[in-house]
Amino acid sequence: MLGRLARPLVRRLYHNRVVCAQKRLDERLDYGLANSTFYKRDTWIDRLLDDVEVQEAIKTSNKNNKYLSHLESGKKARIIAEEIIPSFNALFYLRVGYWFTRNILRLLYWVQVGYPHNKDSDKSYDKIKKNSSVIIVSNHRSNIDPFLLVYMAFRRSAISFSAGEWAKGWPMQQLIHAIGFYIIRRKKTDPLYRCILKRYVHMAVSECVPQGIFIEGALSKNGAMRPAHLGLLNYQIRAMNDGKCKDIVFIPAAINYDKFPEDVSLFEQIANHKKEFRNRNRFFSRLALIGFLFRLITYIFPRKYKPFGCAAVNFGEPLLLSEWQEQQSVNLKDVGEIERRKLVGCLGKTLTDRINSIMPITPMAIIATVILKNQSGRLASSDIKSLANDLLESLSRLKSNMLIAKKDISFSLEQAIYILRKQKIISRGKNNDYYVEQSRKKLLEYYANSINHLVKK
């Protein structure tokens, strides 16, 4: 009896807290929350399943598979929609998600942010109109990338990113959905799945829900940027001038780390020609996550260096799709499919080049470049620092790209050397000089490759 009375009361109290959190978050963010953020998840799902293209895809799926009835095809579509569509919870986002992300990142890194092409810091983003859909376009180096970008953009807007197969399964799926991320299967070729994903992305952009995409489509395998993967980008730009979206604004974001959590396992998979993370057994993926969380406990105690060094994000100049179309003298909605693909590829290349041009120059990348250039002999710590300073001087034209912990170059370089030693990428000899462990040389090359295109200029 007491339980029956208490349950509605608890629900009501929780609902009031969520509404209060939504209002506070809406007031705190410079761009506020999109109106569609306040829709219930079931509303999104019903709207998506009622979409004309989705209904046609369900009928086609039913025709192509004689063993599925129309009702079963509809159920399959609902399961797909429920897997993709997030259930944004402002209370969780504000009280748990942001707090947890901020503290974990600060525990692991010196977090740095820069605006290389803008002397007035981030004021150029004040020109973005509210009826524009904002899309942060970034490179992809780690599975913590979206959390780093959400943390950096927290004052501005709540960003909805796509998460891959690693986020499937309890409890990750529920947590990822609660902070507004949608989950996708990147290699899924089922036409029904692709149609539902396409229409969801179209709906979200047309409702001006801020988005984030990783233009490479997967983690970098060698430290350098991959060619642009155009699937989600193509879906997003189709929403131009639909619904509330009067323009699409792309904001380039370049991410770089001294070290990231899965670098060693990624390197081992590539070296052994194994399949990517998504194909790993879920049990072992969860086990690895639990192991990482336990290791975090050891990082709580005060220490001179951050365990993973610097994490840096540079934001570039916004690119308006309307202005880009004017420059190209074209309207993407008026061209044929073949011509459209070429133009989307051109847009992807433009965004990739912008990201590469603002790539953060981290201490680890500098040290790795210096050691690889002088790998024939051993180097003392003082020699490494001297050569690193010479390289930094030669890159002075890119000073705005350089993000240094505590604004102390010497400290940052020492920290990078400390991390390399801890990872056993370099070792100290009898004469206190350093040499590269050949078995881990590829990891050193990985970090150097992130700025190789800048060093060569």
Which functions belong to the PLM regions below?
Residues 1-212, 217-457:
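Membrane-interfacial terminal anchoring regions of lipid-handling membrane enzymes
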